Design a protein with these regions (language model features):
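Loop/turn elements at helix/coil->beta-strand transitions in domains of secreted/extracellular proteins
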Residues: 66-69, 103-109, 149-152, 179-183
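Primarily recognizes the serine-hydrolase "nucleophile elbow" in alpha/beta-hydrolase
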Residues: 139-208
Length: 257
């Protein structure tokens, strides 16, 4: 299937309905089907309407009826806009996930989460934000003519995505009772944060702790990161939005915890 690079912007979109499709840009995935990089409305951790980006892929041709949907919650890539997985789609790893489902007639959607490819800081491992992104891109896919994303929904995620998937299961009835969620698979979800913190301190992956701490401090007003961080290192927090996980590890792994 050949696609063009034209970006389609919807006319007069609602400014407060989660899942409203704001724009779509075709992405070429060859004979697997059709795909788009999309921008859609979700809700921020502050409860405000926010733009979020992601990917929607479907088998070629108009759906003969409702198709089952897989909503993928991605693992940790970083906190900067440049780390949004949709910017690298299609890649070898993403196609490996998408292809088997497209071949079986599924629609596959994948959010970039709040703050990655959209305004604001990425609320890393903030479950409600992750779950909203996962749900709302399904609603966006449902509004696309011919895609047929109205069938049963399964959510899968690994690592950070596993954390998102757990919150999808926990918050489904509150956030998306309109969606027919029939299954959730949470792979390697970070859950016991006290144990994880002790394990990660001084390791090659200490940067994860800084990402989580900065995210929580930006999300919850009662948390003051400056009160627990060495003043000599505060300026390094700006580096969180200057690169992806490799850059973050390089900057923060050598800092005494």
């Amino acid at each position: 299937t050949t696609t063009t690079s034209t970006t389609t912007t919807t006319e007069a979109p609602s400014l407060d309905v989660p899942g409203t499709l704001l724009s779509s840009e075709p992405v070429d995935i060859g004979d697997l089907g059709v795909a788009w990089r999309v921008t859609y409305l979700s809700t921020s951790v502050a409860g405000e309407p926010i733009e979020v980006t992601g990917t929607i892929a479907a088998p070629a041709g108009d759906a003969p009826g409702p198709r089952p949907v897989l909503s993928v919650a991605h693992g940790t890539t970083g906190m900067a806009d440049e780390c949004a997985p949709s910017l690298r789609f299609p890649g070898e790893s993403s196609i490996a996930v998408v292809a088997p489902f497209l071949e079986r007639g599924w629609v596959v959607v994948a959010t970039d989460y709040e703050g990655m490819g959209g305004p604001g800081i990425h609320p890393y491992v903030v479950g409600e934000s992750e779950a909203r992104g996962v749900f709302d891109i399904v609603r966006a896919a449902q509004s696309m003519p011919g895609v047929g994303a109205d069938g049963p929904l399964v959510v899968w995620g690994h690592s950070q995505g596993g954390h998102a998937a757990m919150h999808v299961a926990e918050r489904w009835q509150d956030l998306a009772p309109d969606l027919d969620l029939v299954g959730v698979a949470a792979g390697a979800p970070p859950s016991q944060f006290a144990l994880l913190s002790a394990f990660l301190q001084g390791s090659d992956y200490q940067g994860y702790l800084v990402m989580a701490a900065a995210s929580m401090a930006a999300t919850y007003d009662e948390l003051d990161l400056e009160a627990v961080m060495n003043p000599a290192h505060l300026h390094l927090l700006d580096e969180l939005e200057k690169g992806c996980t490799g850059h973050i590890f390089d900057v923060f792994n050598e800092i005494p915890y």
